[in-house]
Amino acid sequence: MKKIIICFIFVFSINISFADATSDLIDKIKNIHSMTANFNQKLIDGQTNNNLNSKGNMSLKKPQYFKWITTSPNNQEIVSNGTKLWIYDGDLDQLIIKKVSNDIAQFPYLILLSKNTNNINKLFTVTAQDNNSYILKPKNDQMIDSIKIKFTPNNQLEYLEISTSLNQFTKIEFNNVKTDVDISNTSFDFTAPQDTDIIDETKSA
């Protein structure tokens, strides 16, 4: 009986720690109302041993606005106004327009727009490595193995690490981070340059 009680206490304490970690993470994310930053991204492909480095800038504004601009080595823009998602490839002069997806596997940035603890709990098991680092393990997603979110001591986003089931690892480091900045909603709309090949998937049945 004593062993059963000890086991119950142990399991209960683990559940509390998971809940506390999720709550702490949500509190940090909630405090990011808007944000701009530069980023350096490294993609390591474990299958081919190829590395791909890129850099650019990003901005987000809650509850639904997001922009991710890669300036090197290729010109690519990913912009969302909460309804539509524009994916523009400047090298190919091609624009793909999609409906906004809630698929974390495709768009891990959606975590940064989260404001509902229940949604995080539904999708992930969250553990805290320390006061500023969190590991998110998807409960159902088959593509992502884990996401690590690291904050600075003053609660600014420092980096994201994403490991996938395809043996790929991505680390995105943020610098020149500014939070609670005034960003116009219209900056999250996208107008294609002239002569762009446009594929509008929102019009498909």
Curated annotation (Swiss-Prot):
Where in the cell does this protein reside?
Answer: Periplasm
What keywords appear on the UniProt entry?
Chaperone, Periplasm, Protein transport, Signal, Transport
- Specify whether Signal is a keyword of the entry: yes
Annotated Gene Ontology cellular component terms? outer membrane-bounded periplasmic space
Q: Which domain of life is it from?
A: Bacteria
Which biological process terms from the Gene Ontology are attached to this UniProt entry?
lipoprotein localization to outer membrane; lipoprotein transport
Q: What main location does UniProt list? A: periplasm
| Protein's UniProt keywords contain Kinase | no
In the UniProt record, the signal sequence range is: 1-19
A Pfam family annotated for this chain is LolA
Q: Which family does it belong to?
A: Belongs to the LolA family.
* NCBIfam families found in the cross-reference section: lolA
Q: What does this protein do?
A: Participates in the translocation of lipoproteins from the inner membrane to the outer membrane. Only forms a complex with a lipoprotein if the residue after the N-terminal Cys is not an aspartate (The Asp acts as a targeting signal to indicate that the lipoprotein should stay in the inner membrane).
- Assembly mode: Monomer.
Q: What is this protein called?
A: Outer-membrane lipoprotein carrier protein
